[in-house]
């Protein structure tokens, strides 16, 4: 199921680097000024691993426990698991 990035909410589960991750914070910020998209917004996500396998996968990319400010283009939408 395709979900628009601006529809993602806290507790949604999506894929990041092949790992299921849960969104824990959504931040909308103005994008850098652009003559083509002057009013464009950027959405950033703070995420956490959704399971043990995700922790192992993310450990290959990050040497810390904070996954803050992930860009929406890096997320692959796989499922919505709001609880």
Predicted features along the sequence, with ranges:
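Short beta-strand-centered aromatic/proline hotspots
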Residues: 20-31
């Amino acid at each position: 199921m395709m979900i628009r990035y601006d529809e993602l909410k806290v507790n949604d589960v999506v894929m990041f680097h092949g790992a299921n991750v849960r969104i824990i914070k959504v931040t909308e910020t103005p994008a850098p000024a652009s003559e083509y998209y002057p009013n464009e917004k950027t959405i950033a996500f703070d995420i956490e691993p959704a399971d043990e396998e995700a922790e192992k996968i993310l450990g290959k990319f990050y040497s810390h426990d904070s996954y803050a400010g992930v860009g929406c283009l890096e997320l692959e939408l796989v499922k919505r698991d709001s609880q």
